[in-house]
Swiss-Prot record:
Protein's GO biological process: thiamine diphosphate biosynthetic process
Function: Catalyzes the rearrangement of 1-deoxy-D-xylulose 5-phosphate (DXP) to produce the thiazole phosphate moiety of thiamine. Sulfur is provided by the thiocarboxylate moiety of the carrier protein ThiS. In vitro, sulfur can be provided by H(2)S.
Keyword annotations from UniProtKB, A to Z: Cytoplasm, Schiff base, Thiamine biosynthesis, Transferase
Regions that span the bilayer: none
Full protein name: Thiazole synthase
Keyword Cytoplasm found: yes
Localisation: Cytoplasm
InterPro entries: Aldolase_TIM, Thiazole_synthase_ThiG, ThiG
Pathway: Cofactor biosynthesis; thiamine diphosphate biosynthesis
Lineage: Bacteria, Pseudomonadati, Pseudomonadota, Alphaproteobacteria, Hyphomicrobiales
Amino acid sequence: MLEFYGKRFESRLLLGTAQYPSPSILADAVRASLSRIVTVSLRRESGEARAGQDFWALIKALGVAVLPNTAGCHTPREAITTAHMAREVFGTNWIKLEVIGDTDTLQPDPFGLVEAARILCDESFEVFPYMNDDLIVAERLIEAGCKVLMPWGAPIGSGRGLNNPYALKTMRAHFPDIPLVVDAGIGVPSHAAAAMELGFDAVLINTAVAKAGDPAAMARAFALAVEAGRLAYEADPIEARDMASPSTPLLGKAFL
């Protein structure tokens, strides 16, 4: 069972709530995904606006846990301010910390991320840092107090899947006891299954579901892929080989 900061969840699929064609389609996708955690952007879903109130009512009706994020923040100060606002609006210490360093690739700023994470952890936030796949950055985030890491698979919204599976596999081996979530870049369910087969604890999907022709159907496909990938990992799959290995026994074969 998935566990973040002492809270346990049956589903290993986290779902973003941005870019859906309508609130009803979002609700259908969340239900189809079986996800128990959704991410929310405070900047987009202001609790003071009527639209924000309607959105918040929809999320509460779904009965899912909310993971607010600091999307769009480019400095530690900006991210910290947004995190405090999110805690007040959504009533949770959870925060998906994003400090963006490059506007073209939306690559996280590792230096600003670690700085903001250290301050927020000291202020009793439970931080989910969106990061690259660098082991040293991961070490610094853990030292800062993060108990979950969210390395990217590929740039946000790119749909490229896992750009560097070797780095992700290395991170899994290096941090066997830290919950790891592949965040960003997942395009199709097979990408999610591949991440889970590497031993990751969960994946976060947004654009691939929200922008699909049928978001609810795609959400269901991702739910099945995540489950299949996890089962495959737990089943201890065979290692890839460079040469063939016969699978049919020779017993009973006629020799001339």
